[in-house]
């Protein structure tokens, strides 16, 4: 079935219009020179003529003196050297002399021979032993050269100025092209086309956007019943989940032009440039309809008006936002121009931008679950030779919390490791080594003392042992005392499945296991070190959220005390105002301390009771440096881990 929409001749785009009326454009490339431009040139030349003698006086550093003063100093044998050029004499005194009208004594001078001449001057100079230099009179060529030196820069600057004006008039974008849109246009060709098959792990988001694709392919299907497609679709989600890729897939599936621009590219230092770029972008899109406009990082221009405390760029950003609001609500939706935008800060967007008629549909792109991660890995390993025995579902299960960008990086790192090792395919070892490198950091060749190695071994053994003994704690997959990243040792714990709810018992187990390293140091050595800094940061964050967000403190009660609207996909905003009293803040601090102290006491108690297991695990770490989960269980005597019932 032939679609009438596709048979309609497309309006000429920028490429086809570029070579129209070529001869005419070449003949009138400079265009008419405005009358004010000639006034500017005349004023510039006059200023140059008046200022040049002041900036570049003849005889640099010389003072003009009367001829009689020169003759007097010559008689006093105070003239050291002179240079003559026609009737002009420049020279230098042996000793500086006081000249009427000049505050400072004069050493270099300039004077002129009277019109009636002085026949005795040369003999007097020779008699006094004055060094005489002669310069020829200026020729016609040197005069022209002097004129070019004086007026040439001004003329060149004026010609450059006229060229800029002509370019600005021909492009109709203002001087220097500041108002021109910087949107990049992508035409869906077979070599660069992105489809929904290239996007995996976010099936719900793809289903939401399938209607947009259907509208671009079959607009009459909706228009015949009076329906209109949403003018704006806002993609919301954490960084790396595939929002930009999803937008390009929509354009690839629909087979229409795709204009992409970052929100930060609209705003410039000059007020009004952002609004001009918005207008130009939408004008260009209307000529290419049906098409898609994609604005990445919308929060750069879409922040709530009046909420910024910054002075610089504040008015410019608001003008750009106002123009965007007008354009989205000012053009006919039946023209087939759809605006997609992506952000991970939906809480800061202006309400007028989210109202029906603008960005009235919101698609949340969440982190993929285990099945989604498996599909993403299958997409990214299409062109990667894999070990036939490799099970990608095992890799997907070991990567909870990773998004599409992380998994793509994981596949690339695994392929690089396999190539470095001279393999012909990528196997399980390469994937897990790459995962450790990404999550834990690269191994460092760091020489540490035996005492520090022993402390690190007990510190990591405390983490690992409590991770095995505590109920609901995340499984321990690996422990090492090889320095990685900024840590001297690492205990790698990840949940077996994706978690969406946390019990209080689970959270306390996480705090207790995180404090196991500090507790082991105090128990074995009697002193503590700075090695638990990151552990203390983690447990403080968990305990405070238990008190302020999740209602797990009886004294504080069932209240939510974090500032409203200050958390998003990037985490809490540090610039917030506290919305509770000082007395309640004291209670929150006390309850946070209480939870941490109770968990630390439990960690000390468990490690003291299991001291033999702790010593065995630490000694094994000192020998092997790295232990996997099965080795840890055998050393502490817990036996092989039993699989969970299906």
UniProtKB/Swiss-Prot annotation:
GO BP, sorted A to Z: protein catabolic process; proteolysis
Chief location bin? membrane
Which SUPFAM superfamilies does the UniProt record give?
A: FtsH protease domain-like, P-loop containing nucleoside triphosphate hydrolases
- Mapped to this chain, the residue ranges on the Extracellular side of the membrane are 57-144
Alphabetically, the GO molecular function entries are: ATP binding; ATP hydrolysis activity; ATP-dependent peptidase activity; metalloendopeptidase activity; zinc ion binding
Name the residue ranges with Basic and acidic residues bias.
7-26
Q: Which residues lie on this side of the membrane: Cytoplasmic?
A: 1-35, 166-646
Which positions are catalytic residues? Answer: 460
Q: Give the binding site residues for ATP.
A: 237-244
Cofactor, how bound (note): Binds 1 zinc ion per subunit.
User: EC number(s)?
Assistant: 3.4.24.-
Gene Ontology cellular component list: plasma membrane
List the subcellular locations.
Cell membrane
Q: How does it sit in the membrane?
A: Multi-pass membrane protein
Kindly give the InterPro entries that the UniProt entry links to this protein.
AAA+_ATPase, AAA_lid_3, ATPase_AAA_core, ATPase_AAA_CS, FtsH, P-loop_NTPase, Pept_M41_FtsH_extracell, Peptidase_M41
Q: Which residues bind Zn(2+)?
A: 459, 463, 535
What UniProt keywords are attached to this protein's entry? ATP-binding, Cell membrane, Hydrolase, Membrane, Metal-binding, Metalloprotease, Nucleotide-binding, Protease, Transmembrane, Transmembrane helix, Zinc
Q: How does it assemble?
A: Homohexamer.
- Which PANTHER family does the annotation name? ATP-DEPENDENT ZINC METALLOPROTEASE YME1L1, METALLOPROTEASE M41 FTSH
Family affiliation: In the central section; belongs to the AAA ATPase family.
What is the name of the protein in this document?
ATP-dependent zinc metalloprotease FtsH
- Which species does the entry assign this protein to? Thermobaculum terrenum (strain ATCC BAA-798 / CCMEE 7001 / YNP1)
Originating gene: ftsH
């Amino acid at each position: 079935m032939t679609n009438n929409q596709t048979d309609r001749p497309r309006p000429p785009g920028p490429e086809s219009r570029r070579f129209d009326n070529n001869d005419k454009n070449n003949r009138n490339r400079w265009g008419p020179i405005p009358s004010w431009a000639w006034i500017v040139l005349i004023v510039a030349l006059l200023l140059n003529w008046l200022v040049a003698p002041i900036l570049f006086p003849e005889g640099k550093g010389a003072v003009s003196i009367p001829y009689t003063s020169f003759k007097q100093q010559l008689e006093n044998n105070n003239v050291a050297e002179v240079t003559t050029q026609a009737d002009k004499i420049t020279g230098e005194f042996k000793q500086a002399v006081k000249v009427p009208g000049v505050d400072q004594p004069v050493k270099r001078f300039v004077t002129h021979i009277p019109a009636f001449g002085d026949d005795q001057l040369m003999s007097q100079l020779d008699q006094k032993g004055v060094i005489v230099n002669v310069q020829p009179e200026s020729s016609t060529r040197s005069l022209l050269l002097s004129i070019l030196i004086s007026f040439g820069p001004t003329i060149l600057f004026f010609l450059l100025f006229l060229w800029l004006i002509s370019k600005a008039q021909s492009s109709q974008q203002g001087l220097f092209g500041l108002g021109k849109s910087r949107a990049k246009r992508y035409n869906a060709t077979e070599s660069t086309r992105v489809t929904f098959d290239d996007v995996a792990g976010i099936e719900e988001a793809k289903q939401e956007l399938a209607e947009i694709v259907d509208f671009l392919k079959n607009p009459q299907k909706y228009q015949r019943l009076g329906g209109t497609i949403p003018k704006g679709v806002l993609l919301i989600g954490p960084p790396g989940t595939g929002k930009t890729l999803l937008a390009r897939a929509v354009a690839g599936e629909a087979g229409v032009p795709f204009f992409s621009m970052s929100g930060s590219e609209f705003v410039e230092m000059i007020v009004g440039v952002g609004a001009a770029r918005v207008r130009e972008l939408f004008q260009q899109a209307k000529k290419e309809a049906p098409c898609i406009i994609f604005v990445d990082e919308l929060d750069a221009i879409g922040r709530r008006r009046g909420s910024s405390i910054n002075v610089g760029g504040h008015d410019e950003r608001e003008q750009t936002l106002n123009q965007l609001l007008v354009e989205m609500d000012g053009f006919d939706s039946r023209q087939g121009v759809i605006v997609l935008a992506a952000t991970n800060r939906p809480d800061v967007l202006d309400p007028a931008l989210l109202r029906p008629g603008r960005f009235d549909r919101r698609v949340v792109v969440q982190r993929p679950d285990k099945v989604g991660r498996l599909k993403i890995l299958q997409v990214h390993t299409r062109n990667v030779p894999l070990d036939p025995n490799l099970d990608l579902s095992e890799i997907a299960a070991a990567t909870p919390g990773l998004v599409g960008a992380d998994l793509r990086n994981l596949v690339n790192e695994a392929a690089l490791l396999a190539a470095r090792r001279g393999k012909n395919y990528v196997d399980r070892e390469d994937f897990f080594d790459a995962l450790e490198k990404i999550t834990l950091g690269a191994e460092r060749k760091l020489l540490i003392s035996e005492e520090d190695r022993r402390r690190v071994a007990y510190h990591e053994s405390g983490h690992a042992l409590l991770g095995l003994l505590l109920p609901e704690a995340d499984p321990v997959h690996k422990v090492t005392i090889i320095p990685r990243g900024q840590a001297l040792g690492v205990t790698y714990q990840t949940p077996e499945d994706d978690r969406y709810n946390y019990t209080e018992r689970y959270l306390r187990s996480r705090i207790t296991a995180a404090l196991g390293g500090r507790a082991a140091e105090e128990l074995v050595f009697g002193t503590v070190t700075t090695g638990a800094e990151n552990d203390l940061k983690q447990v403080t964050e968990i305990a405070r959220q238990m008190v302020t967000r999740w209602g797990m403190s009886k004294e504080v009660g069932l209240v939510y005390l974090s500032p409203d609207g200050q958390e998003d996909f990037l985490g809490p905003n540090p610039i917030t105002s506290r919305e509770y009293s000082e007395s309640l803040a004291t209670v929150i601090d006390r309850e946070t301390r209480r939870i941490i102290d109770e968990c630390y006491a439990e960690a000390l108690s468990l490690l003291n009771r299991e001291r033999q297991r702790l010593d065995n695990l630490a000694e094994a770490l000192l020998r092997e440096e790295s232990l996997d989960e099965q080795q840890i269980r055998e050393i502490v005597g817990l036996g092989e881990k039993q699989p969970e019932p299906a």
